[in-house]
Curated annotation (Swiss-Prot):
Catalyzes the reversible conversion of ribose-5-phosphate to ribulose 5-phosphate. The lineage of its organism: Bacteria, Pseudomonadati, Pseudomonadota, Gammaproteobacteria, Enterobacterales. SUPFAM superfamilies: NagB/RpiA/CoA transferase-like. This is Ribose-5-phosphate isomerase A. Substrate binds at residues 40-43, 93-96, 106-109, 133. Keywords: Isomerase. GO terms for molecular function: ribose-5-phosphate isomerase activity.
Length: 231
């Protein structure tokens, strides 16, 4: 794993400015003439703004949410359905938490299922995040699980058996018409947690657990500049 810094000087930056810095830094991975996979959330929104400056150089984007689609279109970027695309060079998205193994918890923006699918198609996953998202142990941020509405109670009971404390995210319906359970108390130590991911899939819940696609490159916004971590 390689780490390097792109310094921004000693200027004190807000969290949003750190997100903006990594969003723009991700442009270096965008190749002209390609279709770009785009995530969802406040950090991804900064990347979309940056991508707008290259709209004449790329074919377009595949979006992970209705919100990102609307923003991309407002900037004049063509949005492809994933079914129209054979492959993606890169997928750029934020994270709720990322550990030293480049594994993440995602889904705070309730777009995790589409995010996971698009990331799985991409050759390279570029994670963009501010330094507050770096952790040693995943799980302080509750693990979002997307569930079909009729299975909410059944999935919640299974999550309790796994040691979690599921909380129904009231009033939230995903772009897929599903609901979200935020699971507290699920400390995830590292790659050996694979079994829990399979259980998550098997009872028709969907989550972005450690065993799912990790980042290939992480751009971390810090007070000292953008830190690049390459897996």
């Amino acid at each position: 794993m390689r780490v390097k810094f792109h310094t921004t000087g000693e200027t004190i930056m807000t969290q949003d400015e750190l997100k903006k810095a990594v969003g723009w830094a991700a442009l270096q991975y965008v190749q002209p003439g390609t279709i770009v996979g785009v995530g969802t959330g406040s950090t991804a929104a900064h990347f979309i703004n940056a991508l707008g400056t290259m709209k004449g150089q790329i074919e377009g984007a595949v979006s992970s949410s209705d919100a990102s689609t609307e923003k991309l279109k407002s900037l004049g970027i063509h949005v492809f359905d994933l079914n129209e695309v054979d492959s993606l060079g890169i997928y750029v998205d934020g994270a709720d938490e990322i550990n030293g193994h480049m594994q993440m918890i995602k889904g705070g923006g309730a777009a995790l299922t589409r995010e996971k699918i698009i990331a799985s198609v991409a050759e390279k996953f570029i994670c963009i995040a501010d330094a507050s998202k770096q952790v040693d142990i995943l799980g302080k941020f509750p693990l979002p699980v997307e569930v079909i509405p009729m299975a909410r109670s059944a999935v919640a009971r299974q999550l309790v058996k796994l040691g979690g404390r599921p909380e129904y995210r009231q009033g939230v319906v995903t772009d897929n018409g599903n609901v979200i359970l935020d699971v507290h108390g699920m400390e995830i130590l590292g790659p050996d947690s694979d079994g829990k991911r399979h259980k998550c899939d098997s009872w028709r819940g969907d989550c972005w657990f450690v065993a799912n696609r990790g980042a290939d490159v992480a751009l971390i916004g810090t007070p000292d500049g953008v830190k690049t971590i390459v897996k």
